[in-house]
Amino acid sequence: KPEGKEATWLFTHVTDLIHYANRSWYRYDLIGPENLQYSIYKVGSFYSEHIDTLYKNQHCRKLSFTVQLSNPDEYEGGEVEVYNGEKPIVLGKEIGSMYFFPSYMVHEVKPVTRGTRKALVGWVHGPQWK
């Protein structure tokens, strides 16, 4: 787990990418990210279909993201699927890749069948939708 300077560098880099993605694709009214979550999925681990929208006071999660930390050769299964209509969008497994999607989109992590999948996930808050 990153601490100290490593954590500061990582959080700064992720924040820069959040701003870039939002400017390029979403243009949401955002305030800032929650603390990052380091996720470990071992054989049999999964996360069933859900949405990330969470309301706190006058703010809500608007943008979700995941960063692939494992080499795809180190595990099987564990695909992240985001639903946008009938067919899910399966996110890539390339180590270091970062994917963004609106927090209101249904998504899931399929069961890991071999090895361990590691990822960094997070959410960005903004004022409630108008």
Language model region names:
Residues K1-M98, Y104-K130:
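Fe(II)/2-oxoglutarate oxygenase catalytic core
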